[in-house]
Amino acid sequence: KSGYVGDIIPRGEHHYGQWMNNHYLYAVKKAADYKICVNGHEAVRPTGLCRTYPNLIGNESARGTEYEAFGGSKPFHTTLLPFNRLIGGPMDYTPGIFDTKLDFMGDLPHGQVQTTLAKQLALYVTLYSPLQMAADLVENYEKHMDAFQFIKDVAVDWDDSEYIEAEPGDYITVARKAKGTDNWFVGGITDENARTAGFTLDFLTPGKQYVATLYADGKDADYKENPTSYQIKKGIVTNKTKISVWEARSGGFALSLIEATPAEKKSVKKWK
């Protein structure tokens, strides 16, 4: 991981001036010589450089998760990123915050990550990066190990991506096929307005059965009042199954679709 946070800049150069632009490129090239991967933070927005230098596996280069609490990023921010920042390459957004209220840190200007817990899971799919973080404290994950299972299961590299529905600034739902497998993961997020996402799993292989595990906002979930309310549902699905998921204000959902084993085909109930 490479980064230049705050005033740690060589020669006092401007953070995003020409000298530093040249320096960021130099760092990526030099790392490639030694077969070292780079995840750059505080660098300029990438413009497809990872195509030439695939060792550049990710950049921050936009307001990440910390700005939701410290800098006042709004709930719609993450619904825009796939259409602007991520066009230039993978983004290390550092998702996975389960305890979104930061009262223990004292008097912060905003003091809360502006999402529900379920939306944090969805970001692992909607915001592409081949290197993902579990950015919260261990003790916060220990309180919700059933939800943490999605972070353990979700892939980080993909063979295929399907953008199911989207309206920049409002909502987005993405399905991705895990590289080298027939497993899929779906993530859906919304802005400050609650909504219901609806879609058919027609991207799945016809004739196959999958175990679907849905991590969704609870009925009383709200990003300000009750961000940790979530529910988990499991069932057998096919490419003809229709999914309908309610998303709370600044909420979302994550859905894993894993090929069913012979035993699971008998023991897991059909999706309803």
Question: Residue locations for each model-derived region?
Answer:
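Aromatic- and carboxylate-enriched substrate-binding clefts and catalytic-loop regions
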Residues: 1-111
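Acidic/polar loop patches that form or flank catalytic/metal-binding clefts of enzymes
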Residues: 35-42, 69-70, 132-144, 160-162, ...
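Conserved, mostly hydrophobic/aromatic
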Residues: 38, 126, 186, 250
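Charge-patterned, long linear interaction tracts outside catalytic cores
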Residues: 47, 98-136
